[in-house]
Curated annotation (Swiss-Prot), chain A:
It comes from Bos taurus. It comes from the Eukaryota. It is a peripheral membrane protein. Residues 20-42 have a biased composition (Low complexity). It is found in: Cytoplasm; Preautophagosomal structure membrane. Coiled coil: none annotated. This is Ubiquitin-like protein ATG12. One of its GO terms (molecular function) is protein tag activity. Its main location: cytoplasm. Pfam families: APG12 (PF04110).
Amino acid sequence: MAEEQESALQLPPSTAPEAEVPTEVSPETATPEPPSSAAVSPGTEEPVGDTKKKIDILLKAVGDTPIMKTKKWAVERTRTIQGLFDFIKKFLKLVASEQLFIYVNQSFAPSPDQEVGTLYECFGSDGKLVLHYCKSQAWG
Amino acid sequence: MEENEFFGEKTFQHYCAEFIKHSQKIGDGWEWRASKDCSDGYMCKTHFQVKNGTAVSHQGTSDHVQTFLPVEEALDPPLDDLEVNETTTAAEVIKYEYHVLYSCSYQVPVLYFRASFLDGRPLALKDIWEGVHECYKMRLLQGPWDTITQQEHPILGQPFFVLHPCKTSEFMTPVLKNSQKINRNVNYITSWLSMVGPAVGLNLPLSYATAASQDEGNVDGQDSSIERKSLEEH
């Protein structure tokens, strides 16, 4: 899946770790701007360079899951996986019958109360935490 | 449907063995139980949880006021070792049992579970729902009887709740395919349990995530350097 380009909305250009080609709109779904949510911040209220407060998360879709237009987010360390669930579900407009899974290491689903800061410490590299997400009908 | 996400009982047992190795390292309490004729078996874990009360004063580190003990601390202690704060009289201790069995018909692992009070009274399914994490409640509540059924444990012959396995291969496939792309060996059991466990109150410590990829072994570097050396000497 060609999903490597992202727009780092919240990163000041000078600190963007990868100087990549500007946003390539994903062909599959054109998702609208996220609802303003307290879960993650695309905003510029604090520089992401201040790694004490926020960490970079890169979201990658697995399987047939819609790709988020914005994949890179600055997230507070104390935000939980549960919080990310809520955020991604809203962003992708998932219905209640659809289950979302988020993975570290591409294969392990951390428990919902796990904080992303901890995940970053354990699984982050190159200044970011890569999380894969997948929607599915897990039940029934 | 591709064959990758299905496996035989031997493979199931292998993944369970690897999983249990790690569990033993971190004291997570999983063990293997073989059936009487040892032809098959299952993996199981028991943990205790305080319901509707304050946290169990267990080594003084738990600050969870909610219903779950952190899994890392929920070792499988004999009851008399479990330090329950005597003043929390309103609290009840619940014993949860989780069993991982292999389903021949679906060719995937299946999670069996049950809960009871210490006096042996079983918990009803509706009580178990209270322990389901918020993020799963929405979906599971829509059709709980589609997803959790009560069945006889194939080896113990006792009633357990079962997380229905019919969709397992469907949600495991993308994960496995994705990992295969990058040539990573995934412990199916670890991955699967991390996904379904939280729905029934079972959380896996993070260290399992890195344990799985360590199992691949790092023989290459050492062997080749040894070979090189011996060649040079000759």
